[in-house]
Amino acid sequence: MRILEKAPAKINLSLDVHGKRPDGYHEVEMVMTTIDLADRLELTELDKDEIRVSSHNRFVPDDQRNLAYQAAKLLKTRFGIQKGVSIVITKTIPVAAGLAGGSSDAAAALRGLNRLWKLNLTLDELAELGAEIGSDVSFCVHGGTALATGRGEKLKHIATPPHCWVILAKPVIGVSTAEVYRQYDASKVEHPNVERMIEAIEAKDYKEMCGSLGNVLESVTLKMYPEVDMIKRQMKRFGADAVLMSGSGPTVFGLIQYESKVQRIYNGLRGFCDQVYAVRMIGEQNALD
């Protein structure tokens, strides 16, 4: 039997980080939404009791470092599954980009294996399991648009944002999330108004949504990696309505309301960055098929 699953990327429309918890994680408050840039997973049952992960992308690990591998191992262990599986990942989401590509692959593996192995788990149950793999996996199991709190695993689903285009640009650098968090000081940054963002989304107010974008990690990453700031400035210069770094970076996204502007901004950014994408904001929970 073969199962196909879609694994969409996400962006943070608002990202606030508070104090460090006793377990070493930070308390976060984030508004996240899915976009139609997605990996594809093909899951096939094997006769041999083993987990095989493969991808055409050489930067994707094929062992226990891979979050999709961890998802399969978790389900096998938790439910006593004595079957093997092959997981083939076709990557479209850039690796280590702040777009939750690995987390979304893990979430897709959980959903796909739930069907393949007929576990009959609900999405909420899969999301609970996903939290054991990574902070973003719970959100990625559901997709859509949500307020995430705790370390990212506590979700409150909210309305779909106003429809718009999203331009993404990833510079050819890697960002150490651990180092960004190490240098982050909650007392020295301007914190976004997360509630204002939620209200703008609920009201389908595009202008207010653009004005409410915020990411407390941005100032830290911009100091460490000037290339990210350059992309932000270029994206604004080419006409994006609002611009923000996603997650801990290095990917920058811009929101564009009208399709007529998208190609011009895309073409302009291609002169500065190889990895540029023009996609739509999905933001709906039923958009994973």
From Swiss-Prot:
InterPro entries according to UniProt: GHMP_kinase_C_dom, GHMP_kinase_C_sf, GHMP_kinase_N_dom, IspE, Ribosomal_Su5_D2-typ_SF, Ribsml_uS5_D2-typ_fold_subgr
Chain positions recorded as ATP binding sites: 94-104
Disulfide bridge partners, by residue number: none
Annotated catalysed reactions: 4-CDP-2-C-methyl-D-erythritol + ATP = 4-CDP-2-C-methyl-D-erythritol 2-phosphate + ADP + H(+)
MF terms (GO), sorted A to Z: 4-(cytidine 5'-diphospho)-2-C-methyl-D-erythritol kinase activity; ATP binding
Chain's role: Catalyzes the phosphorylation of the position 2 hydroxy group of 4-diphosphocytidyl-2C-methyl-D-erythritol.
Name this polypeptide is given: 4-diphosphocytidyl-2-C-methyl-D-erythritol kinase
Protein's organism: Bacillus pumilus (strain SAFR-032)
Record gene name: ispE
